[in-house]
Amino acid sequence: MVDTTKNTKLFTSYGVSTSKTVAPEMAAKLISKAKRPLLMVGTLALDPEILDRVVKISKTANIPIAATGSSLAALADKDVDAKYINAHMLGFYLTDPNWPGLDGNGNYDMVISIGFKKFYINQVLSAAKNFSNVKAIAIERGYIQNATMSFGNLSKAEHYAALDELVDFL
């Protein structure tokens, strides 16, 4: 079992609170309990190993995908519910309780992020952390301070194994 709760050295100094580390099993439980989760996918998920696991997460838990950057093209033929949105705009929209969501059925109660550079996703999730009730779980390779919960800093092999465990627990 991969220990995703270790090595949480901060590389940024902003914010008054930091995310709690989360193991794949607990992340899967929280994702399963969410009423309206959204999988937020960045361009770093274009790595075939990550992309395969993103598709498995989406299909296993029936979670729609917010495809940001150039990730939509890679998801187009994967038979998943993926829609394009700018990542910063998504962070802004998540703070609006009246936002209809990408499907018109209302805002989300949880966002799961994967495939982003650390400095970028920390800024995007800062809005959700400080101005909404939306919970954010970062299943990134690096520890994300502004998520509600995050994996720790992992090697590539540990990250792949942690994502596999997450899929198994969903």
From Swiss-Prot:
The keyword Translocase does not apply. Pathway: One-carbon metabolism; methanogenesis from acetate. Keywords: Methanogenesis. Transmembrane segments: none annotated. Signal peptide: none annotated. InterPro entries: CdhB (IPR003704), DHS-like_NAD/FAD-binding_dom (IPR029035). Part of a complex that catalyzes the reversible cleavage of acetyl-CoA, allowing growth on acetate as sole source of carbon and energy. The alpha-epsilon subcomponent functions as a carbon monoxide dehydrogenase. The precise role of the epsilon subunit is unclear; it may have a stabilizing role within the alpha(2)epsilon(2) component and/or be involved in electron transfer to FAD during a potential FAD-mediated CO oxidation. This is Acetyl-CoA decarbonylase/synthase complex subunit epsilon 2. GO terms for biological process: methanogenesis, from acetate. HAMAP family: CdhB (MF_01134). Optimum pH is 8-9. Heterotetramer of two alpha and two epsilon subunits. The ACDS complex is made up of alpha, epsilon, beta, gamma and delta subunits with a probable stoichiometry of (alpha(2)epsilon(2))(4)-beta(8)-(gamma(1)delta(1))(8). Belongs to the CdhB family. Pfam families: CO_dh.
